[in-house]
Amino acid sequence: MNIRKALPEDSEELQRLQAKCPQGKSLIVSTVNLPDFFSRARAYKSPRVFVACEEDQIIGSAACAIREAVVGARVLRVGYEFQYFTSPDYRRRGVARRLRHKIESHLTDQRAALSYALIMEGNLPSMRLFEREGFRLHRELVMPAIAVFREVEVPRAENIRPIAPRDLEAVAELLNQTWHGHELFEPTSAASLAHQIERIPTLDYSNLLVLEDESRILACVGLWDWSRIMRIAVLKLNLRMRILGRLLVLARILPRFPSPGDTLRQMMLTMIGYKSPAHLAPLVKYVNNLALREGIEQVFCICERGDKILESMKGFTRVDTAVNLYVKPLEPSVSIADGPVCMTGFDM
């Protein structure tokens, strides 16, 4: 088995392999990166995708990215590991473990002080892999998903607009204030935000929104349309999920529930900043209506349980999924603090 850096010409083979590797336990889906395999990794400034090969055949892949983030009151280089998958024909042969070793070697060479990964609830094989590799469960986060199916009244709608380049300094200041004291937050600036908007697929000024009052920005949110980054096709629902879906439809809480054959359209909230949760709530309602017009079925984010962000989602039909944050220090003197953590939404 050979582990190497993925090349642009690997894209189609990786997409075909990815489609053969279902994800999930209760809602089982097939995911394929769009429009090419590497678009998902372009959300990061310094990504690296690796592939495992048996002769000339790709049998597995994993990705990582390096960024600056707060760890224990210091801004350090950290690695994020994501999109591990192995061909069904090569499971239990150590493919993921070999990819993991390659990623850690790369992160160490790049002087990353810590690595982290997000693992969905119930994904026991991934949890066991990372625990064997020296990671520990740091926190159980939550991924709240708002079901988008009806228009809602938006207070202060006249004060909501897309951002303009002139707003970047104020938005950066608001983000830094909102997430001050949070582990894994990457302090930002107007220049950093401008570079992100230019680099990240599907992100532009039109889908970064602000709520303002007398020229003062009170809240901001970015909209990352996952349906343009990844095709998510429903393959199967377990019994519990099928029963839940029927109950929600019968009770008229939802007009319909995902079923096999559906392609999910989802939107991630990112770059969330606010003076108060009360300022964020109108933006969430505005996003709901915007998503409804564009055929988006779920809007979600990642945050701490009990985070103030959840207050802005009151009144919506919401399904919460647990997401486990695993961390591993790569330097002896580094330790993530026990305080709250910040997840931007790109890490999913």
Residue ranges, per PLM feature:
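Short, high-confidence coil segments that cap the C-terminus of an alpha-helix
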Residues: P47, Q110-A112, S206, R293-E297
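Amide-forming acyltransferase catalytic core, primarily the GNAT-like/NAT-type
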Residues: A6-E54, A69, E131-T263
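Hydrophobic adenine-recognition pocket in adenosine-nucleotide-binding enzymes
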Residues: A6, Y84-T86, I163, I272
